[in-house]
Amino acid sequence: MTTTHWIAMLGLIGAATAGDARAQTGTDIFMAPLRQTGRNVTIGAPVNLTHRAGYDNQPSFTPDGAALLYTAIGDKGQADTWTIRVANGATPSRVTNTAIGVYSPTVMPDGQSFSVIRVELDSTQRLWKFPLGGGEPTLVLEPIKPVGYHVWLDANTVCVYVLGRPATLNIVDVRTGNATPIASNIGRALVKVPHHDAVNFVQIVPDSGQWLAEYDVAKRSVRRLGRLPEGADYVAWTPGGALVTAAGSRIYRWNDGVWAEAADLSGAGVRNISRLAISPAGDRLAFVAEDP
């Protein structure tokens, strides 16, 4: 059985498929100060938090913003959840010790558990949860598989990317397991819109590239907002309502239908930025980039 080994010193009471992780070796997690003034977003000098050869990816902040949960693949190819405090010089600590692997750790709305995409012994990928205080995992969605990515909208509702041809986006009531398909041909980015009952995702449009789209839960409607910059796959919101994305070494901010450059981190040796996470206070940006 899988167990968690939660580090009490953290003082804590936010997916990718296995194939995706294996294909993206050689990544580190970086942290940079972030400041939002009106519509402007400023990104400071980044610090490499994980700084090792191998796969360190899928960061998400804890509710207090003091630490990150993330996925790391060890020397034996096993993917597990790790944690690291955001203070400079902090040492990563292992949280799970699994037989095959878990991905995309995200603290759940109840603040008592974190959810993961767990690869089971028969290679099935489903949504599970672990207690933050340590203990055995529990299956969250029994019938829905294979799950690749997920984001929580509230304590009873989760938005999941279900692998397939095409991949589909589904809103699921975890109390009943009832799933409502809302889109297909989607990318890997799933983020909740702050202060709104809505979720952003990437819509892949043939011959037109990747578009940022939004699903309004109350209206049950999808609208396209605009194309992503070339090479961008992920987005993140600040608590103050600024939407950012990244491509190459650059961070961009959404500004009235146009992506405006917020920072060029090439001078810091940052290459191929992918996943993004912003702290609950909006003062830090965590991102994934290639190993230096």
Role assignments for model-derived ranges:
Residues 7-15:
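Bacterial N-terminal signal peptides
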Residues 19-292:
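Sequence signature of WD/YWTD-type beta-propeller architectures
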Residues 1-7:
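Bacterial N-terminal signal peptides that target proteins for export
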